[in-house]
Amino acid sequence: MDLQKFTQQVQQTIADAQNLAIASEHQEIDVAHVFKVLLTESDFAKRVYDVAEVDIDALQKTVEDALTKIPVVSGSGVNYGQAMSQALFQLMRDAEKEQKQLDDDFVSTEHLILAVMDQKSNPITMNLKKQHKSKKQIQEAILKIRGGKKVTSQNAEENYEALTKYGRDLVAEVRSGKLDPVIGRDAEIRNVIRILSRKTKNNPVLIGEPGVGKTAIVEGLAQRIVRKDVPEGLKDKTIISLDIGSLIAGAKYRGEFEERLKAVLQEVKQSDGQILLFIDEIHTIVGAGKTDGAMDAGNMLKPMLARGELHCIGATTLDEYRQYIEKDAALERRFQKVLVPEPTVEDTVSILRGLKERFEIHHGVNIHDNALVAAASLSNRYITDRFLPDKAIDLVDEACATIRVEIDSMPSELDEVTRKVMQLEIEEAALKEEKDPASERRLEILQRELADYKEEANQMKSKWESEKNEISKIREVREQIDHLRHELEEAENNYDLNKAAELRHGKIPAVEKELLELEAENREKTAQEDRILQEEVTENEIAEIVGRWTGIPVTKLVEGEREKLLKLADELHQKVIGQDDAVQLVSDAVLRARAGIKDPKRPIGSFIFLGPTGVGKTELAKALAFNMFDSEDHMIRIDMSEYMEKHSVSRLVGAPPGYVGYEEGGQLTEAVRRNPYSIVLLDEIEKAHPDVFNILLQVLDDGRITDSQGRLIDFKNTVIIMTSNIGSNLLLERTEEGEISPELESDVMQILQSEFKPEFLNRVDDIILFKPLTLADIKGIVEKLVEELQIRLADQEITITISDNAKAFIAEEAYDPVYGARPLKRYIVRHVETPLAREIVSGKIMPHSSVEIDLADKEFTFKVTE
């Protein structure tokens, strides 16, 4: 017996049968061992018996019984599974005869299945006879599966019914109602139909950005085929979606992948144009299965594509088409391009309306129309790195899932009460152990409290469960309507007019009426009482998801946020002292943006802050970040002195291709891409190379910039603040009593215009002049710095108070109009914080003590009280 004459699957089956015999301590490998392996591991054997309508469970039980009857041999020196039984040897001989009769090159699994039918006394054959299955019936099933193919390779079993194994029948999925409806895209579907109707090169390739609905167009074509809404040439055709992944997966030996693909193509060819092959991500066939000297899938397709023997629909993205298919001109010319543009917001809304019912049935929720409109418009405005309708569909899906999870999980109010009950029960158990009168009194009070909480918990639980049941009932009725509509479609397609009439005029209206009654009852209950569960998906839920994805607040303003925004200017005044105009302009820009009336095509605001050092330019940006986001982490600070050389400018948007750091992206663009709602602070802009401002022109005007990777970065939700010391000499010399005269402002602007190009300055919203700080401002800043010191010492539980004399002395001593507030910090560190630190370290100031700082003979005194 030559093992090379057997297919790989038969060889593997015998090896596994031997392992089974060894594990079972059987001396010989028997037919039962082989069939145990075939029925558990061979998909082909199961498929044969399935087509022959054999009860596989009964057959498996027979095999199990036969195995238990084989004697177990134990003892030393016994070799298990080293010999074949007489019956198995005969089975192999008979299998070889079957192979010759069927004119095959190798002995494969089907020959074993046929050969066992010749062993009349074998329990397997007896069981099949009992099921009234003859050898002829089994042979017919095998020939049906083989589809006229011969066993010409050692991988033969892999290649039977290749389309079923490596593809999905989209038309069958439409018939069984598994695919979502396809709305719109009529022009593209008509274009595909036109190309498919050609004599040669009838192979459309759908090209478009990820998420625009390329696969949906093919699904739409499948739905039209089912509805017979296609030209005569396409009626009754089948669309098979080929899964390249499963075609490649498990191809261990050279040539195995090509063999599988050849089997697929052969089946398509044999269908005489009845099968349209859809290859999603068609660029994967270029180079697929290629090893040294081997032919790749793309080259195998070319001859059939050119001759029109293969109707193929491809789908790929623009980038991948350019990268893979355009390089192979011979493959490209065999396809006809169909460009799939991104749908408009209006088209997306109609797509969402078409899918609304499917989402409602799946999630068991109620979707408002304003939620669909919000999903399309908000995703278009805020999620800029993805494409419609995919991103809008994802938004609706996630919003529905959020509501569904809330329905299924315990409401927070009930959860709180349940936890309180548990806590009181633990306390009750502890108090029962105590025997003193006080504990007994406390136990009585606690038991009354516990009874109240338990009653409340039970009421809430029953209310929650009844609401949940109502929602589930509505969901079930919706599913029933969907199922009946699918049945109606099937009946109409099969011209079963009696069934169609019964469904259309009888069953469907009755169930729809039931649904309307349930929904009306539900609405009535909602109006009368407070509901625990929410089943409505509104625009607020969509806005919350957008905020969660992007970090941009797009939900409607809640009361607390309104107050926060209206008080933004006051909050900033407390942190940035003496710069009222600057604070007002910046807070107004944020107010306009949050109210939703800013220009949607530009950043929230762009400002140039001009003024001497230490007057609060950077401090205002920090204060704004803290007030808007409760942390300074949302401030993207870029020191423009790092961009003084021409070659360093590219670091903002990323190194060009071929340079080190190309993959990392730009310092500015990457920061904004990850955090689209932030404050961008460009510090000391006059120190940057002039080319930097050419990059910023697009950002300031259109709120967008393209990075080195070709990605569009959205700056529409950023506040751009640029600081500069230009004109600070004039501001210091000519500011009178803390006011800037119009002449001074004009002179500073002239200096600014000589430094920067007019097209740059013209795009900035406001140029704000910061006044040099007066002595009164400095006193206010002293108060602020002392408060900060008090907060730092509060951690050590030390309180400090500074007398007014000491504060006034600090302000006068540290005041320097040229350097602003920075010397003030240094002065407090040197003359207040350092002596204070020395006292703390020496142990003179202990925790829980208070320190009074006063002035005596121009020296600070520290009086400690416990």
From Swiss-Prot:
PROSITE patterns registered for this protein in UniProt: CLP_R, CLPAB_1, CLPAB_2
Region (C-terminal): 773-866
Signal peptide: none
Region feature Repeat 2, mapped onto this chain: 84-148
Clp R domain ranges (all copies): 3-148
Keyword Zinc among UniProt keywords: no
GO molecular function list: ATP binding; ATP hydrolysis activity
SMART domains membership: AAA, ClpB_D2-small
Top-level lineage group: Bacteria
Region (Repeat 1): 6-70
Stretches for region Linker: 343-551
Any Pfam family matching the protein: AAA
Binding-site list for ATP 2: G611, P612, T613, G614, V615, G616, K617, T618
Residues covered by region (NBD2): 561-772
Region feature (NBD1): 161-342
Entry keyword Repeat: yes
Entry similarity comment: Belongs to the ClpA/ClpB family.
Domain statement: The Clp repeat (R) domain probably functions as a substrate-discriminating domain, recruiting aggregated proteins to the ClpB hexamer and/or stabilizing bound proteins. The NBD2 domain is responsible for oligomerization, whereas the NBD1 domain stabilizes the hexamer probably in an ATP-dependent manner. The movement of the coiled-coil domain is essential for ClpB ability to rescue proteins from an aggregated state, probably by pulling apart large aggregated proteins, which are bound between the coiled-coils motifs of adjacent ClpB subunits in the functional hexamer.
Subunit architecture: Homohexamer. The oligomerization is ATP-dependent.
Protein's UniProt name: Chaperone protein ClpB
Organism in which the protein naturally occurs: Listeria monocytogenes serotype 4b (strain F2365)
